Amino acid sequence: MENLLSTVNAILITGPTASGKSALAVELAKRHGGAVVNADSMQVYDTLRVLTARPSEVEMQGVPHHLYGHVPAGAAYSTGAWLRDVSALLPALRAAGQLPVFVGGTGLYFKALTGGLSDMPDIPEALREELRGRLLMEGPDRLHAELAEVDPAMAAGLNRQDGQRIVRALEVVKATGRSIADFQGQSGPVVIDAAQARKIVVLPERAVLHARINGRFEKMLRERAEDEVRALLALGLPAEAPVMKAIGVSQMAAMLSGEMTRDDVLEKGAAATRQYAKRQMTWFRNQMDESWERLTL
């Protein structure tokens, strides 16, 4: 077994959904005595293991995996929260001599990891819950009008129906008395020095990726992902909860209510996944510079 700890501080692997990056992470972790660390914003939740393609015990192949399924479905979990969890985890991995292998399709996580994300303030949970509740009861227009009174420049740049961003801007100004724009201009802490990491972006050919996406969604249906969605819906979470926006939730909810057939779910779920993968591919091509290795798996 080759150990890279003396030459690199981490391996970073990203790419669109269904690109094969999780299997690559396991392969590299086994080769270099590493541990896999999740960098996917949907795979952090303790629900939807099948629907979010969280690695199974078989797929993990005995390699330690961290930050998967550790967040309750209804909990607020931001990029900053993920970064704090990573910062708390890394000393233990270093002490064990394990090379961290980060893998996931959430580009902002990688920007945060290497210090390219704004250092946002902590928001009191009570304030966050209050504003999320008001968003549900009053709607985004009302909160947008309130934001316009205290931070007109930020309000002017936001879509009046973008409830999540409106709430985010409001909670920052209420908690700090400052515009969120003030914090967006500041760089966050560097947790992983990008210059000392091996960085890989997996960019499969379009036809290959689409075939994998179709196959993955068929597999999810065979593994009864709708049971996960049924359990999720039973929690009564607000539609604004991030976990409710996982691809496949709305389609399977429609199937459970009799509004869609299983074939409809397969077609529409796979189509939504392909669109998401297309957005990811565009983001990676624009954001990942030449220091990232391009792989086609």
Swiss-Prot record:
Per the UniProt entry, the Enzyme Commission number(s) are 2.5.1.75
Q: In this chain's numbering, which residues are marked as the site (Interaction with substrate tRNA)?
A: T106, R128
Residues the record lists as binding ATP: G15, P16, T17, A18, S19, G20, K21, S22
Region of interest called Interaction with substrate tRNA, as start-end residue ranges on this chain: 40-43, 164-168
Keyword match ATP-binding: yes
One GO-annotated biological process of the protein: tRNA modification
Report whether Membrane shows up as a keyword of the record. no
Q: Which cofactor does it need?
A: Mg(2+)
> Main EC class of this protein?
transferase
**What keywords are assigned to this protein?**
ATP-binding, Magnesium, Nucleotide-binding, Transferase, tRNA processing
Alphabetized HAMAP family for the sequence: IPP_trans
Function, as annotated, reads: Catalyzes the transfer of a dimethylallyl group onto the adenine at position 37 in tRNAs that read codons beginning with uridine, leading to the formation of N6-(dimethylallyl)adenosine (i(6)A).
Oligomeric form and interacting partners: Monomer.
Family assignment from sequence similarity? Belongs to the IPP transferase family.
Kindly provide the name given to this protein in its UniProt entry.
tRNA dimethylallyltransferase
Annotated organism of origin: Rhizobium leguminosarum bv. trifolii (strain WSM2304)
Q: By which gene is this protein encoded?
A: miaA
